Amino acid sequence: MADKKKRKRSKDDEAEELPFKSILESDDVITELLKSYISSSIKAAAGAGGASSSSSKPLTLADLSLSSSCREVADLSLSSVQTEIETVIVQIARSILAGDGFSFSVPSRAASNQLYVPELDRIVLKDKSTLRPFASVSSVRKTTITTRILALIHQLCLRNIHVTKRDLFYTDVKLFQDQTQSDAVLDDVSCMLGCTRSSLNVIAAEKGVVVGRLIFSDNGDMIDCTKMGMGGKAIPPNIDRVGDMQSDAMFILLVEKDAAYMRLAEDRFYNRFPCIIVTAKGQPDVATRLFLRKMKMELKLPVLALVDSDPYGLKILSVYGCGSKNMSYDSANLTTPDIKWLGIRPSDLDKYKIPEQCRLPMTEQDIKTGKDMLEEDFVKKNPGWVEELNLMVKTKQKAEIQALSSFGFQYLSEVYLPLKLQQQDWL
């Protein structure tokens, strides 16, 4: 009898110690609320689509009469990439033979050449090019690197093999000097040829991972992401290997940090609330961005984002949703529409009574980044984002997802996220 009283008392104490746990509904109630939200969202989307809802194709630059002023790339076959490279080289050879010198016409990826298109809700690249001549001290080295990259990709096309960006760098370390230089030219070449980077058969090393209610085929092998342990399944760097996605999830949870991902994976959060959990462990990589978009488009699931409450967390969210300026030429393939900002939001710091010792003062650079983001069109489009960013800049406070651990290591999965889902508290 004493043991029963002790157990009851310990449960009561736990409820008192965990802020807001007492107002949580049961998992079944929260699940039903989510089902209702998803159902109404689908109906609303169908209604808003009107006559165009019968077509599954998203808006394109051509639909907005922007295809002549903006540049976008497409997936090309290896033979097409090979042909494009050979065409470029033939043009250069003719120019040299005519005595006009040797130069590449390279699309400008400068920040001033980026354009946010509200109708598409993503950043695109304006169609403006610059010359990269060989007979110029300022550009001779970059022109040489461009030529070398083109030759290497041509070899990949002939052999029909994939290499990593690191492999590419090590083919000529003395010339490239630093991988950031070969990576940048690789993006230039992709843009020049009018193809996605994956069309070049150059991939990044595996970085992102996924766990939860998802089954898909990886190069013909069926993968069940509920049986991959805490570490989850590494996201294949070649999206062409991925197919036949199946899921009974209600949403996709996009997590910024590996630590938060591991907490949710170990607690098997996806079994309490059917979901798919994915992370790129920080900055979004191309493979994770492609994989997230594929899940969103094929499974038709809402995407909820869990990021740090700082300008960089929101920046990461915006890269997934609106694209990066560095790869705006491929934003059609790399962006995931309508990602909801679940947390951690600046207003959550007071709402969830995050202790002062778990909050961090923003640096001058943090504040500048926050103010710069307030000037971005994709932020201005969302009043909720503007309000949260203004609050962050005003209070000069930031916090990581791990700040929730001050209430207990499992507070994230036991209270914070369930309550967010219960209240449908996202922007």
UniProtKB/Swiss-Prot annotation:
Residues annotated as the enzyme's active site: 170 (o-(5'-phospho-dna)-tyrosine intermediate)
Record's GO cellular component terms: chromosome; DNA topoisomerase type II (double strand cut, ATP-hydrolyzing) complex; nucleus
Record localization: Nucleus
Residue intervals of the Topo IIA-type catalytic domain: 76-209
Gene3D superfamilies cross-referenced by the UniProt entry: 3.40.1360.10, Winged helix-like DNA-binding domain superfamily/Winged helix DNA-binding domain
GO molecular function: ATP binding; DNA binding; DNA topoisomerase type II (double strand cut, ATP-hydrolyzing) activity; identical protein binding; magnesium ion binding
Residues annotated as binding Mg(2+): 256, 308
Annotated PROSITE patterns: TOPO_IIB
Reactions performed catalytically: ATP-dependent breakage, passage and rejoining of double-stranded DNA
Biological processes, Gene Ontology terms: DNA topological change; epidermal cell fate specification
Class of this enzyme: isomerase
Tissues in which the UniProt entry reports expression: Highly expressed in leaves, stems, flowers and seedlings.
Domain of life: Eukaryota
Cofactor: Mg(2+)
Main localization, broad class: nucleus
Keyword Nucleus carried by entry: yes
InterPro entries registered for this protein in UniProt: Spo11/TopoVI_A (IPR002815), Spo11/TopoVI_A_N (IPR013049), Spo11/TopoVI_A_sf (IPR036078), TopoVI_A (IPR004085), TOPRIM_Topo6A/Spo11 (IPR034136), WH-like_DNA-bd_sf (IPR036388)
Gene disruption: observed consequences: Plants are defective in cell elongation and show a severe dwarf phenotype.
EC numbers, comma separated: 5.6.2.2
Entry annotated with the keyword Nucleotide-binding: yes
Keywords: DNA-binding, Isomerase, Magnesium, Metal-binding, Nucleotide-binding, Nucleus, Topoisomerase
Assembly with partners or alone: Homodimer. Heterotetramer of two TOP6A and two TOP6B subunits. Interacts with BIN4 and RHL1.
Similarity comment: family membership: Belongs to the TOP6A family.
Function: Component of the DNA topoisomerase VI involved in chromatin organization and progression of endoreduplication cycles. Relaxes both positive and negative superturns and exhibits a strong decatenase activity. Involved in cell-elongation processes.
Protein name: DNA topoisomerase 6 subunit A
Species of the source: Arabidopsis thaliana
Gene: TOP6A
